[in-house]
Amino acid sequence: MSSVETAGKRPAKVEAGVKLRGAEKVARIPVKIIPTDELPKKPDWIRVRIPVSPEVDQIKQTLRKHKLHSVCEEASCPNLGECFSSGTATFMIMGDICTRRCPFCDVGHGRPNALDPDEPKNLAQAIADMRLKYVVITSVDRDDLRDGGAQHFADCLREIRKLSPSIQLETLVPDYRGRMEIALDITATEPPDVFNHNLETVPRLYKSSRPGSDFEWSLDLLEKFKQRVPGVPTKSGLMLGLGETDEEVIEVMQRMREHDIDMLTLGQYLQPSRNHLPVQRFVHPDTFAWFAEEGMKMGFKNVASGPLVRSSYHADQQAHGAKHD
């Protein structure tokens, strides 16, 4: 089994553009991840369809043609096959190298390259080529940028809307640590149709799961966006299986509602590799269903809760439900 210990010796400085994954990625976080002997056996209710189809290949080719990244691939999402096969994708902008080292995440860490000024237009053209109706735009954390990448988000949305005027756009943003006000001011100039930022886990587990992030900061980000753009639904999500209790999940859901968050996603954490945080429990589908019921009682406009639910899974259906309830 895996365990968590105090971090030890730090490795050499990483060159810009070099992507660290696995053990190298988590080497400098406040806690040390001891690799598991093997990945845990998944229960019967977790079954993922192998992502092989003409639609999957076509979308991958389009991404490569326009030099784009999908979080579906970078984060090893279990729904990649279903979403790609239905002709939808979540795009990851600002490169594929993150400035954070979250040990649950499979996206690479390092010193990112400079932003690609052509990315907004390339992204817009790719989305137009694929004739998508609902798109989620997310990004790596870019702590190296003065605005955390908020202007690049706005530029992407603006270019996409030029070529696809009827499209619905959801943004899944980082926490804009240390630059919330400037980031939100920029975001308000070109707001998305849904503003999403994931809390990921309960406050007690932040040090081990989200080093460099702060639970209260993330809640405030969602609330302050809603204050600036009250007509846009806000959304957040949690991964279950990192060591949280059911009671802690309910408490976080209540805090979300106190901060006027409209939509909720709850999914099972799946350990990407032996060098990531270990799965502490596999939450039964009945428990996910119970969380969904409790969430609706609390006043969420839409709750997507299930073992394979991810932040952008069926995001179009969730947004439609939130706007018509």
UniProtKB/Swiss-Prot annotation:
Known cofactor(s): [4Fe-4S] cluster
Gene this chain is encoded by: lipA
Pathway entry: Protein modification; protein lipoylation via endogenous pathway; protein N(6)-(lipoyl)lysine from octanoyl-[acyl-carrier-protein]: step 2/2
Organism (species): Stutzerimonas stutzeri (strain A1501) (Pseudomonas stutzeri)
UniProt cross-references to CDD domains, sorted A to Z: Radical_SAM (cd01335)
Disulfide bonds listed in the record: none
Subcellular location field: Cytoplasm
Membrane-traversing stretches: none
Annotated positions binding [4Fe-4S] cluster 1: 72, 77, 83, 312
Annotated Gene Ontology cellular component terms: cytoplasm
PROSITE patterns: RADICAL_SAM
Protein name as it appears in the record: Lipoyl synthase
